[in-house]
Amino acid sequence: MTEDAEKRRYWLMKAEGEPRYVKGINVAFTFEMLEEITEDGKMESWSGVRNYEARNMIRDEIKIGDYAFLYCSNCKFPHIKGVMRICSNSHPDDSAWNSNDPYYDPKSTPQNPRWYSVGVQSEYKLDRPVTLRELKMHKENQLKSMELLNRSRLSISRVKPEEWKFIHELSKQPEPEEIIKARLQEEEKVAKRKRKLNLSDGENKAKSPYSSISENDASLDIIKRSRIKDVRSQKDNAL
């Protein structure tokens, strides 16, 4: 083991795994997105942290060469998919100064920054994603002290070396059957909802007087204007 590896600390950093829009901007961030951004050696700024305890970890503890799990939250099956490498020390988070940014904070300024970020790069994917459900299966033994499981609201948490190693070992094993079953059940629920929406949409279109007319058909506009005229006539007659 190299000297850098011996000094390395381990972290878990949360990002939103499914689309969510703030100020019209999608704040989701996945490991695949990180891979694409950093594939040519570029650095991505881990910005948007707006919790003081997590901010302090970024500012005072996280260092170049540390590793972090990228943990996808805000999804049906929160999970760890890959590992990031910290490639810069902390610096003021300039996203807080941009009024158009989802994480804008008017109380943070370049002269008096309130929030900090670090640079990250994708390092490698796990052999398979490890879900929160699976981690919780080991809460009474190997992962009983893991911060993620005991302080779940933190957006950044520390990971002990033995926890880091154990999670990697989990990723090399087949996913537990109960989790596979739960995922399949959820996928079926989603499929049923989609089928129901499609069916409902089809029924509504069938009821529409325009359902058999192309959007480009000039007669469509004539029919619409005719119906508007009919409505106006009915109102006039009522008066």
From Swiss-Prot:
Main location: nucleus
GO cellular component: nucleus
Keyword Nucleus: yes
Lineage summary: Eukaryota, Fungi, Dikarya, Ascomycota, Taphrinomycotina
Nucleus recorded as keyword: yes
Protein's name in the database: Uncharacterized protein C21.03c
Cell compartments where the protein resides: Nucleus
Protein origin, superkingdom: Eukaryota
Entry-linked PANTHER family: THYMOCYTE NUCLEAR PROTEIN 1
